[in-house]
Amino acid sequence: IHYMYTRGDSAWNNEAEACIGGYALMSSEKIRLFDNLSKRTVEFGVLLNETDASEVSNNHVERVKNPRGKPSLDTEGKGIFIYGGGINTVEGNSFEACDIGAGVAMGGEGTVLHNNRFVGNRLQVRYIGSSSVEWSREGVGNYWSSYQGWDLNQDGVGDIPYQPNDSLDRLFWLYPQSRFLMDSPLVVFLRFITAQFQLDKGKGIVDSNPI
């Protein structure tokens, strides 16, 4: 499904499988994309490009993989790719087993993501930008299978923020041959130190209320 230069449309209960891309919303406004399935696509599950005032909710995206994708060209498969300006809401979706869970570039910071699930993606987020971006709303963030924090008061919200695009992630992006170290005790310790001293504060995407 490809929306371009449209306004006020809706798409639901669709399935996209084994194709180049799932659902593309481009240069459009007030689109509702909900309760759809996308699996085994190559480039993206959901694309938001220069789209505004739209809602992407309760969709399930899995296994977006580009066998020819190159990190240096940002051509890997993305569960959701947000490119260009616009203020949109992305909530209640699941992005699983993709090359990249969410890609954000060139002014996509206005879109708010909360109450989504990012599970088993090789890289959870790739953000190309320098702004500080918050991915939670009213105390509700997202679920991250790679979150290494804790919830001591057992309220269902992590006690420390999750930064899926921190300095270590950017290092692994630049040097993919070092990915085998991602879950090592040393990297876990370095992430802890980075969080304690707020070394990455004000940089990139932050989920202050991971669930």
Locations of regions flagged by a protein language model:
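Parallel beta-helix/beta-solenoid
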Residues: 1, 5-6, 11, 28, ...
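Short coil-to-beta transitions that initiate beta-strands within beta-rich domains
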Residues: 28, 40, 73-78, 82-85
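Membrane-proximal low-complexity regions enriched in glycine and acidic/polar residues
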Residues: 83-92, 96-112, 119-120, 125-126
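Acidic, glycine- and Ser/Thr-rich low-complexity intrinsically disordered tracts
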Residues: 107-211
